Amino acid sequence: MHKTDLLEDVYDSEILDRESPESTELAEILKLKEEYDESKSKYQMLSYKPYSYQREFHRAVSDAGGLARQRCLMAANKVGKTYSGAMELSYHLTGWYPDWWEGHKFNKPILAWAAGQSHYITRDILQAELLGEPGDKIQFGKAALPLDLIVDTDRNPGVPNAYASVIVKHKSGMNSKLFFKSYDSGL
């Protein structure tokens, strides 16, 4: 519900007079809340708060105590594995890391792959977590990667609403590149 809808409901119920100081104050509070909600949906990178198992995964420490070159996040269904992976990838692509980040940091742009079993699964799961719901222009850039850091996209011609690659603005001023791949096409 938008602030204007909520305000109209309040006025219609005659709880507040449109001209009262309280009404003006309520309108301002609702406007600030709407701006906050919009910002939060636009910058998921900033609001991600990992669970302890996700935080440990992000630390990327090997059994020997050094930096792990390969990792596997195994957990139950629907507990945030894909989401945490998308958040980590967005940090690496952009170079913008949260204060709590203890894992590896890329100070230069990177070249990365996000791969799934098929192009359709890659689109429906990985692309959705990183860019927003496939085919929904309003939701594009309201996922792990914010719209203002997406420089360019290249469509996957064989799959509706799928991208083959995305260019992402890195903190260094240069650009990272993300490719969407599928295992069934041989990567």
Regions found by a protein language model. Give the residues of each.
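Phosphate/NTP-binding elements of NTP-utilizing enzymes
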Residues: 1-187
